[in-house]
Amino acid sequence: MDLFKTHYESGERATDEGLLTHYYKNNYQQTKTALLEVARELEFTLAFEDDTRQELMLKRKDCEVSVTVVKINPIETTVDFTVNTSGIISFGKGKKVIQPLYQALDKRLMFKGLALNR
């Protein structure tokens, strides 16, 4: 039940299609730039950035989002999100945070597919 769930993750084996890993035909820098632009538009602030681990931490008053960008090869990346929401009752907010992030990235980047290594 999503009513009390405060932790959501996207991934290759997610049971909800809206939470499956997204693959892009873009290099790491292009993907990261698009992520930061989308984050600003959705009122997130950048709390942490580690290019070595290819991770970003985004914050907003209602949640924290950890973003992992995996460089598959020089021109392909994947993006996964982990969302933690505050409060006892979340009404599935984590999923509602992840889906708009993916939708905006899909418009800015060259979307390749969902969970291709499933």
Regions found by a protein language model. Name each.
Residues 1-118:
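Ser/Thr-rich, low-complexity intrinsically disordered terminal regions
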